[in-house]
């Protein structure tokens, strides 16, 4: 920190400058390079930088007439040594630095670069904290760990794991990388359960590594992300192999430190390769190209078989080329190489032995920085271009799997398409690639040489029991109840489901049930669930409804019972009455139907009147025909034939309408007559809200808060009820006697209540949809495993058998309170019989009136003669009249048709008779005139 404050102090000494300027384009441009010569990355970078300088100097299109001169310094990843070497560079008038390699060095010399305006092009610093706002002259030519940690989080999320353990080197590189991992996991609702930091020099301390791994073994997660340096990483894997942590059940994800070693030392020594079997590794992705393949051929000639090329060697090469192209643009824009000194630094240098007067400021540093950032080129690592935040565009990683004597490519990750088995450069050509149909990763050979995906979590074998909260209910004990005489033993439907699910888990889960409640009234389930967040409970088992406010603080298993709020109210039967046959249609329907019958009859009469004799005749007859035809179509019994085309068309359509009306009427009437109708003044939750009647709810249920907060029902209307007996009494008394109009409760409780109380029923629909589940802390893997077990219970029928054991009641089921079939009684039909009887009596009455009129209107001649011959005895007259009445009733009456025909025939006979009479008279007159004849 003292060195940092020194450089901050120097930044204020910016007066009294004098300048050393090269007025012409220099023949040699000096650049520096700082990295660790002995590291895997440094060994490759040294060769790559030398080759890049050679290519720049031999290319006439870059810096024509100017040569690169590079000076390399070994920082050994030491902050102090890095600062010293950087100070030495500042004495040599360099215009740019390739490096540094390590985060600790980058943090130190970036402050110096800011003050002296010398761009730093780092090919290996992945620390995401290196911000361009804080370090404007720091340019990262590699990929940031921000993207690498995003890729790891995507892998963890893809396989459905929830918790990971992070092993990291305890310096800027490790801490900042793990912080980025934590953020990326948190954005996916995942988390780091345990962070194990190791000192960079811990590789030689076997005991410290062993103690750290033993702590990890006692934890539940089995996903380990290791973000360290090479030697430390291999030491961790060696001890993990010894402890059996490289076998079944574990998942190890290594950052790019391992892929760098795999690429540079291919193949790894057998003893090291054996310790990393099944590990997933990330490697910065570089697209394939002819330029890259040609460089690999050159590399084999340069290094032989002693050192293989890794990704960071490619980044080092591209860093030199980027600086060269930036300088080329700088010169073409008229830039000059010039340096300035501070007069104050000269004074300080003369007064001491620090030689500060030799430190110079690069006057063209800001212009060169802009030219570098504005350069676009295609190098060994693909397209080299920067985003506004100084990150490389199109970041991508290879995901490889160590198996056997080598590695397997199982997929890729990019910030454009996420996980995929398709090359990222192909997906970048699509605006929004659809990855739903393609596999995201290939099959992995996991530790233990298995293709089965590890669960990623085990129940910790540390001898501790899970503290499971159980509600101490005072009602509906079929669901959960404490066994009398015990403290931590419970029974009931919920307990049996939980026990059966736990027995299906592939690992043992020791639990201890802890009662919650005072035993006098049902406890608050929301408060009980909140105790999970405070650590009082490790879980809650019981009839706990899955509702929104609870899911925000805990995780629930798959619902093992359907639940939702319903309204229970008293009901009464509505029997079908004498006028039930009128109920299928309302008044308007009856009126419209009758009018339609008349209208169709009139229309058909109009269409048939001129052509059809059956629709002709006197007005009275035609009116009767219209009425008869209209209403006889109701039964398809009309006798009049239609002869016109239009008449037939209208009749066909009308008969189809009549068919539909008859069918609907018959179906509705059948339902009314054969099904009992149940009635309640409350039709559902909406009608209950509109009334001012009191509403009952179960103590401890979430129904109270739902009614108050969601439905805005006044608290004064809510009546707490504790037992089924209290339910029945409150409903029976009703609002007038201090009871309730209805009760709102969850369906399982209601079904159990109605199984023994048939005077009540559910009215309306279930107005919330939820279920019962077991509650555990957020992101608990146990909730996931138990959900799978509950689904298995449902599939094999065990869940239904447990339900039938505790909740199946035979005394009075809910169906008895629903609509049911019954026999038909006379009271349902006496109205029809009455109408029919009245019609019959009325017809008889009119008929007898007509007979009597005929009896007195047209007496026969024989009857008159007999009346004259007999005495006037009253009894004889009554007998005679009765005989005449009976004789008249028995006499056949001419039909109107026959009467009309008879009249016509009589008229014709009269006409012919008069003609014959007139002829006879003429003949007689003729004979009298001619007597001789």
Curated annotation (Swiss-Prot):
Please describe what happens when the gene is knocked out. Answer: Impaired glutamate-triggered (and Ala, Asn, Cys, Gly, Ser and glutathione-triggered) membrane depolarization and calcium rise. Reduced wound-activated surface potential changes (WASP) duration in the wounded leaf, resulting in a decreased induction of the regulators of jasmonate-signaling in the systemic leaves. Glr3.3 and glr3.6 double mutant has no detectable changes in surface potential in systemic leaves and the induction of the regulators of jasmonate-signaling is more strongly decreased.
Q: In which tissues is it expressed?
A: Expressed predominantly in roots and siliques.
Q: Which Pfam families match?
A: ANF_receptor, Lig_chan, SBP_bac_3
- The intrachain disulfides are 758-812
Keyword annotations of the record: Cell membrane, Disulfide bond, Glycoprotein, Ion channel, Ion transport, Ligand-gated ion channel, Membrane, Receptor, Signal, Transmembrane, Transmembrane helix, Transport
- Per its UniProt record, what Gene3D superfamilies does this chain match? 1.10.287.70, 3.40.50.2300, Periplasmic binding protein-like II
Q: Report what the protein is called.
A: Glutamate receptor 3.3
Q: Which organism is it from?
A: Arabidopsis thaliana
Quick one: which gene encodes this?
GLR3.3
């Amino acid at each position: 920190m003292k060195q940092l404050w020194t450089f901050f102090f120097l930044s204020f000494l910016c007066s009294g400058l004098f300048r050393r300027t090269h007025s012409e384009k220099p023949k040699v441009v000096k650049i520096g390079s700082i990295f660790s010569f002995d590291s895997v990355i440094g060994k490759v970078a040294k060769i790559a930088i030398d080759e890049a300088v050679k290519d720049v100097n031999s290319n006439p299109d870059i810096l024509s007439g100017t040569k690169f001169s590079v000076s390399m310094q070994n920082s050994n990843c030491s902050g102090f040594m890095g600062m010293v070497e950087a100070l030495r560079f500042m004495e040599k008038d360099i215009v740019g630095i390739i490096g540094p390699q390590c985060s600790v060095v980058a943090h130190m010399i970036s402050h110096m670069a800011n003050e002296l305006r010398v761009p730093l092009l780092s090919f290996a610093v992945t620390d995401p904290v290196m911000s361009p706002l804080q370090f404007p002259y720091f340019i990262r030519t590699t990929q940031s760990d921000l993207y690498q940690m995003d890729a790891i989080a995507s892998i963890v999320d893809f396989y459905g794991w929830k918790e990971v353990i992070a092993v990291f080197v305890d310096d800027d590189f490790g801490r900042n990388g793990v912080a980025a991992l934590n953020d990326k996991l948190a954005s996916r609702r995942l988390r780091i359960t345990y962070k194990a930091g190791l000192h960079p020099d811990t590789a030689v301390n076997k005991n410290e590594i062993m103690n750290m791994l033993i702590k990890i073994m006692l934890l539940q997660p089995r996903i380990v992300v290791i973000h360290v340096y090479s030697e430390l990483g291999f030491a961790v894997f060696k001890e993990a192999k010894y402890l059996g942590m490289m076998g079944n059940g574990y998942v190890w994800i290594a950052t790019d430190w391992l892929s760098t070693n795999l690429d540079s030392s291919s193949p790894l020594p057998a003893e090291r390769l054996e310790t990393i079997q099944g590990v997933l590794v990330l490697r910065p992705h570089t697209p394939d190209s002819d330029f890259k393949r040609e460089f690999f051929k050159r590399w084999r000639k340069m290094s032989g078989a002693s050192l293989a090329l890794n990704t960071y060697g490619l980044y080092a090469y591209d860093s030199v080329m980027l600086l060269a192209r930036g300088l080329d643009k700088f010169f073409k824009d008229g830039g000059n190489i010039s340096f300035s000194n501070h007069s104050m630094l000269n004074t300080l240098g003369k007064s001491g032995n620090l030689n500060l007067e030799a430190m110079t400021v690069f006057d063209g540093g800001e212009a060169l920085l802009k030219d570098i950032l504005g350069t676009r080129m295609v190098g060994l690592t693909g397209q080299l271009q920067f985003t506004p935040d100084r990150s490389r565009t199109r970041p991508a990683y290879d995901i490889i799997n160590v198996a056997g004597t080598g590695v397997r490519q199982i997929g890729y990750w990019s910030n454009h398409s996420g996980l995929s088995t398709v090359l990222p450069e192909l997906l970048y050509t699509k605006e929004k690639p659809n990855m739903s149909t393609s596999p995201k990763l290939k099959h992995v050979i996991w530790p233990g040489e298995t293709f089965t995906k590890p669960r990623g979590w085990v129940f910790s074998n540390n001898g501790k029991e899970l503290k499971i909260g159980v509600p101490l209910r005072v009602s509906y004990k079929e669901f959960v109840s404490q066994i009398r005489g015990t403290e931590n033993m419970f029974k009931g439907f919920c307990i049996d489901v939980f026990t059966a699910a736990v027995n299906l888990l592939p690992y043992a889960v020791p639990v201890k049930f802890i009662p919650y409640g005072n035993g006098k009234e049902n406890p608050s389930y929301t408060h009980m669930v909140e105790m999970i967040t405070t650590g009082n409970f490790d879980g809650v088992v019981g009839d706990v409804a899955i509702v929104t406010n609870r899911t925000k603080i805990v995780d629930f298993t798959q619902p093992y019972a359907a639940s939702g709020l319903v309204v229970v109210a008293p009901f009464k039967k509505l029997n079908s009455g004498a006028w039930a046959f009128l109920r299928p249609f309302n008044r308007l329907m009856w009126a419209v139907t009758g009018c339609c019958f008349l209208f169709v009859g009139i229309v058909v009469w109009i269409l048939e009147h001129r052509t059809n004799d059956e629709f002709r005749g006197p007005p009275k007859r035609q009116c009767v025909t219209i009425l008869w035809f209209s209403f006889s179509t109701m039964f398809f019994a009309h006798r009049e034939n239609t002869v016109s085309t239009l008449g037939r068309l209208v009749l066909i359509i009308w008969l189809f309408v009549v068919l539909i009306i008859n069918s609907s009427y018959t179906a509705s009437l059948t339902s009314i007559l054969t099904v009992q109708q149940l009635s309640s003044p409350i039709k559902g939750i909406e009608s209950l809200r509109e009334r001012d009647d009191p509403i009952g709810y179960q103590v401890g249920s979430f129904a109270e808060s739902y009614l108050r907060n969601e439905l805005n029902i006044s608290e004064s209307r809510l009546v707490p009820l504790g037992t089924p007996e209290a339910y029945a009494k409150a409903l029976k008394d009703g609002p007038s006697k201090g009871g309730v109009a209805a009760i709102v409760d969850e369906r399982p409780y209601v079904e159990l209540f109605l199984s023994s109380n048939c005077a009540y029923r559910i009215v309306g629909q279930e107005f919330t949809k939820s279920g019962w589940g077991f509650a555990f802390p957020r992101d608990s893997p146990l909730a996931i495993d138990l959900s799978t077990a509950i689904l298995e219970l449902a599939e094999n029928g065990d869940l239904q058998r447990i339900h039938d054991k505790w909740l199946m009641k035979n005394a009075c089921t809910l169906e008895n309170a629903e609509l049911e079939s019954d026999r038909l009684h006379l009271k349902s039909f006496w109205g029809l019989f009455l109408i029919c009887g009245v019609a019959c009596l009325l017809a008889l009455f009119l008929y007898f009136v007509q007979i009597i009129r005929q009896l007195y209107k047209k007496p026969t001649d024989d009857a008159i003669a007999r009346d004259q011959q007999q005495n006037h005895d009253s009894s004889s007259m009554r007998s005679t009249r009765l005989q005449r009445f009976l004789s008249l009733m028995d006499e056949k009456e001419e039909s109107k048709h026959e009467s009309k025909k008879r009249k016509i025939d009589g008229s014709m006979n009269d006409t012919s008779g008069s003609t014959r009479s007139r002829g006879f008279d003429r003949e007689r007159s003729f004979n009298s005139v001619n007597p001789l004849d």
